[in-house]
């Protein structure tokens, strides 16, 4: 039996195809561009159902309405092989279900693959990706535990588990799993990412800066998502300490412009620009530079978490396509899963209102969406953007009571957070509490307090 580098059965003995399968799996797990070579490998070997199935899966990950259309070519080719290879057959079923938007079936089949082949970390990663997009964090943990049980010697499995623990708020377990991944492979980027989440959540800002600055050399050569996203996390740490110019430098050099056509690069840029503005920092013409790429998303309703950020970016750039995208989301919500109409639409309405300066409308709509934000996917750190927008709307309408409550709760996680304390100065002065305003100012280094 022919096996891949993890010990899973494959349907070819062709050396080039075998290498291509290994490059796809290893590159996918490690966020390396070599994974993209599976397209050429599949084109060169139409008799490998597995190679063509993997090529189709890769195209589904572009997170674009074009994905299923592009993937169908490889699905048809894989099906034409009439393979009897058990693993290839299940992957073909996975691809078919995903193209048909039958996500429950994709999840069932991918976990079935992991049960059949305990070292199939590709199946584990695919399952976690889809559950992540639906906010099912306990499912991530279940899959992560299976992955480490089947492949305890592979660093990527512990990275998968670490992030799952973190999203379940099991921070000590998350840190331990991330450190185990790094013991096995110091360059494991998903473990870097999981530890960044832990440190941010626990307010270990200086430690987070030191850690990420110490491992950033490992991100060179990774695919654009992992490269830009880990830099995005480093930018959040610097933003929390008021290092505004450093954040802008990171944005310009490491967050935007690596692969501007890609969905994750776009929402990372939108999110960081929005956070900069919410912190009172002028971002110049950066929204305008981002806008041409977002304008291509006017009909994009692939993932709610992505669509609402495209919309916010378009609105901040002053583009009419923001209204067109909102109309597309309304149309999609009629027949889509309930989360689109019940959470995504009010979130989109609220973000659009905020971007255009209607803070009261923003508060009204965001108040509907925020309690159920978990259902649209995105990590805790990513979804926090929407809470920050809602907080900014409170400040703009003069809801000092609500803002004070929110800000002091946020300060429990990081007492020295500069944007939080800047806002508290304004709030306490408005509330007639100059002593508290003085203390907030002191926390950002403005003055000393006796």
Please describe what each predicted stretch is.
Residues 13-18, 23-39, 43-47, 52-88, ...:
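Inter-helical turn/loop elements of alpha-helical hairpins
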Residues 14-20, 47-50, 84-90, 117-124, ...:
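Generic helix N-cap/helix-start motif at coil->alpha-helix transitions
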Residues 26-27, 58, 92, 96-97, ...:
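Residue-level signature for tetratricopeptide repeat
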Residues 28-31, 62, 100-101, 134, ...:
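Structural motif corresponding to the intra-repeat A-B loop/turn of tetratricopeptide repeats
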Residues 34, 70-71, 106, 140, ...:
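Single-residue signature of alpha-solenoid repeat helices
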Residues 40-41, 77-78, 112-113, 146-147, ...:
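Canonical positions in the second alpha-helix
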Residues 144-241:
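Internal metal/ion-chelating core segments
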Residues 233-448:
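Helix-coil-helix junctions within alpha-helical repeat/solenoid scaffolds
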């Amino acid at each position: 039996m022919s096996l891949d580098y993890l010990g899973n059965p494959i349907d070819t003995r062709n050396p080039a195809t075998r290498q291509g399968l290994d490059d796809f799996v290893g590159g996918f797990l490690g966020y390396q561009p070599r994974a993209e070579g599976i397209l050429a490998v599949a084109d060169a070997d139409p008799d490998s159902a597995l190679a063509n199935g993997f090529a189709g899966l890769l195209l589904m990950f572009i997170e674009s309405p074009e994905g299923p259309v592009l993937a169908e070519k490889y699905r048809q080719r894989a099906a034409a092989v009439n393979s009897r290879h058990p693993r290839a057959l299940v992957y073909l079923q996975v691809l078919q279900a995903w193209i048909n938007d039958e996500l429950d079936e994709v999840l069932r089949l991918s976990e079935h693959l992991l049960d059949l082949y305990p070292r199939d970390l590709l199946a584990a990663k695919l399952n976690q990706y889809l559950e992540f997009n639906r906010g099912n964090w306990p499912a991530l943990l279940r899959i992560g535990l299976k992955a480490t049980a089947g492949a305890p010697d592979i660093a990527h499995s512990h990275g998968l588990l670490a992030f799952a623990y973190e999203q379940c708020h099991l921070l000590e377990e998350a840190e331990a799993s991330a450190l185990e991944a790094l013991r096995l492979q110091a360059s494991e980027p998903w473990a870097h990412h999981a530890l960044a989440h832990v440190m941010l959540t626990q307010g270990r800002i200086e430690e987070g800066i030191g850690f990420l600055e110490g491992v950033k050399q490992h991100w060179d050569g990774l695919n654009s998502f992992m490269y830009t996203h880990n830099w995005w996390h480093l930018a959040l740490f610097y933003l929390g300490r008021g290092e505004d110019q450093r954040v802008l430098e990171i944005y310009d050099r490491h967050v935007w412009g690596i692969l501007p056509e890609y969905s994750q690069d776009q929402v990372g840029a939108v999110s960081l620009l929005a956070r900069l503005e919410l912190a009172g920092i002028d971002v110049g013409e950066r929204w305008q530079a981002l806008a041409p790429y977002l304008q291509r998303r006017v009909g994009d309703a692939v993932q709610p978490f992505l669509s609402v950020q495209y919309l916010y970016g378009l609105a901040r750039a002053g583009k009419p396509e923001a209204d067109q995208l909102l109309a597309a989301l309304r149309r999609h919500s009629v027949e889509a899963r309930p989360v689109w109409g019940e959470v995504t639409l009010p979130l989109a309405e609220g973000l659009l209102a905020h971007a255009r300066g209607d803070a009261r409308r923003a508060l009204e709509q965001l108040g509907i969406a925020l309690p159920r934000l978990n259902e649209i996917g995105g990590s805790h750190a990513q979804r926090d953007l929407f809470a920050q927008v809602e907080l900014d709307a409170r400040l703009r309408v003069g809801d000092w009571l609500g803002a004070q409550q929110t800000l002091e709760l946020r300060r429990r996680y990081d007492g020295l957070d500069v944007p939080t304390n800047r806002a508290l100065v304004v709030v306490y002065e408005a509330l007639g509490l100059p002593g508290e305003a003085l203390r907030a100012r002191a926390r950002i280094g403005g003055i000393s307090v006796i």
